[in-house]
Amino acid sequence: MDMGGLDNLIANTAYLQARKTDSDSRELQRRRRSLALPGPQGCAELRQSLSPHFHSLCEQQPIGRRLFRDFLATVPKYSQAVAFLEDVQNWELAEEGPAKTSTLQQLAATCARDPGPQSFLSQDLATKCRAASTDEERKTLVEQAKAETMSFLQEQPFQDFLASPFYDRFLQWKLFEMQPVSDKYFTEFRVLGKGGFGEVCAVQVRNTGKMYACKKLDKKRLKKKGGEKMALLEKEILEKVNSPFIVSLAYAFESKTHLCLVMSLMNGGDLKFHIYNVGTRGLAMSRVIFYTAQMTCGVLHLHGLGIVYRDLKPENVLLDDLGNCRLSDLGLAVEVQDDKPITQRAGTNGYMAPEILMDKASYSYPVDWFAMGCSIYEMVAGRTPFKDFKEKVSKEDLKERTMKDEVAFHHENFTEETKDICRLFLAKKPEQRLGSREKADDPRKHPFFQTVNFPRLEAGLVEPPFVPDPSVVYAKDVDEIDDFSEVRGVEFDDKDKQFFQRFSTGAVPVAWQEEIIETGLFEELNDPNRPSGDGKGDSSKSGVCLLL
């Protein structure tokens, strides 16, 4: 009997079954019935320690945003402001056409009304709206009205929210969020892959059913290879990033043997797999454009935070269940300090820009756009620009080609727009590269993206051209993933233990709150008719101890 094949079948079956788990499963229901929010009396200290900022509390944090909206709905003047903002957002995200133009005119008419004592808009704005004669003028004024409304909400409505029971409830959720996290918080499933310091496996949060990928970094291996600084940098960068186009960090914790990063689980496999292992080599142009648009948004989000990715390639671009893609593996990402160039060589051969390959490397953000050009080329042609499929090339020869050869387009699927964007991204000199030619050089304006509505894409309203098969595990068989040998002769001192504690910060607020809302736990624990905990003990006690 093929025991390896049997092990793989068992691992895949358990993993696929876990992915199908929903809130109706008996075990999950039993666990959730035992949960309770911490009592309000435990929030006094937290209230004093927090300095609430409108943007963080009411816009970035999903539970804060939800409770702020619930509060605003209780005050007529405030709810009118919210309704206006929703109308503006619907207009912004609408497809171009007569309906969008009509909505703009209706919004401008709303702004033109005389503001009464209950209005959140100014008299000056109303006067300008009445005088507006073109849609371009109306567009500018509606954007101004949006800004005025946001400013209004940040003043008295925000202060009223902080004094309301809705903010008290937010503090209870923050206490719940701050509970300790350990490996007991999760159920672990099959190994999905491995890296230099450990393996990646699928895990499931026991109390919500949410599936994640857990990157387990072997503590001894980290110390032996001197990888602590790199691991902490990746963790801190992931914490800063909140983008639908980059994998999210949800938890950081330690077990006895590992440091663990719990991140978005991308079930659809990586783009390299789809380029080379599904059908004919390469991808359909509709997919190339869609993925490139999402990858471009991800790179722009990183650059906006002062981060250079340095490892953009199809292998690091992962698909989710719906077919949307995200950038992953930020292990080589680096923050730019005071606009100073980076001098350390890092990246993957075949995707590194010429300025990285020079004897004295000195580079910055443009290297990511060069890698974007390599990735577009590979998605279309099923090979990289400077190395043919399965061609054996030395590192030195590949370096020489990258620095000197002009890119050639022999594959029949290259359109003129695709050739042009590849040439611009693959420019040898960074100052001539698309995305870097001037401060406001925006790759999204290139004709290659003429069919992409970027505001709708960022809002998740564009349907992906390909949806992964939910019954397929897009990962190597478990017996093909090599086990790590045990690291011997490594002992930990107090400095190591301090580092492990610094790394293990628990739940990441935005991702954790999204999980709580997405899995229905927010509604369950907020239900005033819900029995307290499991019906045993004092319901006012903290629910933290019940969660683990």
Swiss-Prot record:
Residues 450-515 form the AGC-kinase C-terminal domain. The gene is GRK7. GO terms for molecular function: ATP binding; rhodopsin kinase activity. Residues 523-548 are annotated as: Disordered. This is Rhodopsin kinase GRK7. It holds the Pfam family RGS. Inhibited by phosphorylation of Ser-34. It is found in: Membrane. ATP binds at residues 192-200, 215. It comes from Ictidomys tridecemlineatus (Thirteen-lined ground squirrel). Retina-specific kinase involved in the shutoff of the photoresponse and adaptation to changing light conditions via cone opsin phosphorylation, including rhodopsin (RHO). It catalyses: L-threonyl-[rhodopsin] + ATP = O-phospho-L-threonyl-[rhodopsin] + ADP + H(+); L-seryl-[rhodopsin] + ATP = O-phospho-L-seryl-[rhodopsin] + ADP + H(+). InterPro entries: AGC-kinase_C, GPCR_kinase, Kinase-like_dom_sf, Prot_kinase_dom, Protein_kinase_ATP_BS, RGS, RGS_sf, RGS_subdomain_2. It is an enzyme of class 2 (transferase). The lineage of its organism: Eukaryota, Metazoa, Chordata, Craniata, Vertebrata. It comes from the Eukaryota. Residues 546-548 form a propeptide. A lipid is attached at residue 545 (S-geranylgeranyl cysteine). Belongs to the protein kinase superfamily. AGC Ser/Thr protein kinase family. GPRK subfamily. It is a lipid-anchor. Residues 54-171 form the RGS domain. SUPFAM superfamilies: Protein kinase-like (PK-like), Regulator of G-protein signaling, RGS. PROSITE patterns: AGC_KINASE_CTER (PS51285), PROTEIN_KINASE_ATP (PS00107), PROTEIN_KINASE_DOM (PS50011), PROTEIN_KINASE_ST (PS00108), RGS (PS50132).
